[in-house]
Design a protein with these regions (language model features):
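Active-site- and interface-proximal helix/loop "cap" or "latch" segments in soluble metabolic
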Residues: 37-38, 71, 75-228
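N-terminal intrinsically disordered, cationic/polar leader segments
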Residues: 38-66, 72-81
Length: 228
């Protein structure tokens, strides 16, 4: 408890100057973002750290799709990065963007990355390696491809995090990938979570033809289709 009180006291001291920003953050949280979680223990009224991530999907005139990702990290108090550069409250520590251009098969045809804000001067060099993801498929082996092509010091931790989760908005953008295309196979999102469990009520209600579907049956059907 002492540690928590000390932390709150320190927060009040170092957050003295950007009070207006903190007030805006609290107001936004209270008025625009009601919290459905149960009440927490006593804590600072404004968050210490905020990370906002947004994904957007667009249909292109050439038949492709663009999926864009944006990441912003902010503090509600002034900080010094590595004891040198001062970053005021509300100014992003990280502000990064990615655009993927994909086809109907979820294959990456183009990728662009940019860093508006970053902690070190040479961080943007990590965007060059992003081109290695061209030709990779979001639908299969996506996380492995990211680890193989952008892992460790080759890439950027935050760009990798954005890429990891671009698969879901990509599927939501290319809507026909969720439908039944007459192949006899279930849509790709079935069997991937509790809500769409083949043995659950969701599939029984909305996809009764795939109720109690077995993955091995799916594999056998794929092999038969390929051979034909």
């Amino acid at each position: 408890m002492k540690s928590g009180l000390a932390h709150q006291t320190r927060f009040k001291i170092i957050a003295g100057d950007p009070a207006r920003f903190r007030h805006a953050v609290v107001a936004r949280h209270n008025n625009g973002y009601p919290m459905p979680l149960p009440p927490s223990a006593s804590r600072t009224p404004a968050p210490i750290h905020m990370r906002d991530v947004k994904y957007r999907g667009y249909a292109r005139d050439d038949g492709m799709w663009d999926v864009e990702a944006e990441l912003i990290d902010q503090k509600t108090y002034d900080i010094e990065l590595h004891g040198r550069r001062k970053v005021p409250a509300g100014k992003p520590i990280h502000h990064m963007w990615i655009r993927l251009t994909i086809d109907a098969d979820m294959v990456v045809h183009g990728i662009e990355a940019a860093m508006d804000d970053h902690p070190l001067g040479h961080c943007p060099q990590a965007t060059k390696s992003m081109q290695k993801m061209v030709g990779c498929c979001i639908a299969r082996g996506w996380r492995r491809a990211i680890a193989d092509n952008l892992g460790g010091v080759v890439g950027c931790t935050h760009l990798r995090e954005l890429l990891f989760n671009m698969a879901t908005p990509a599927f939501h953008t290319v809507l026909n990938q969720f439908g039944n295309n007459g192949s006899g196979l279930p849509p790709r999102h079935l069997g991937q979570c509790l809500g769409w469990d083949f043995n659950g009520p969701g599939v029984a209600e909305f996809y009764p033809e795939f109720k109690d579907w077995k993955p091995q049956a799916q594999q056998q059907l794929r092999e038969t289709t390929t051979q034909a």
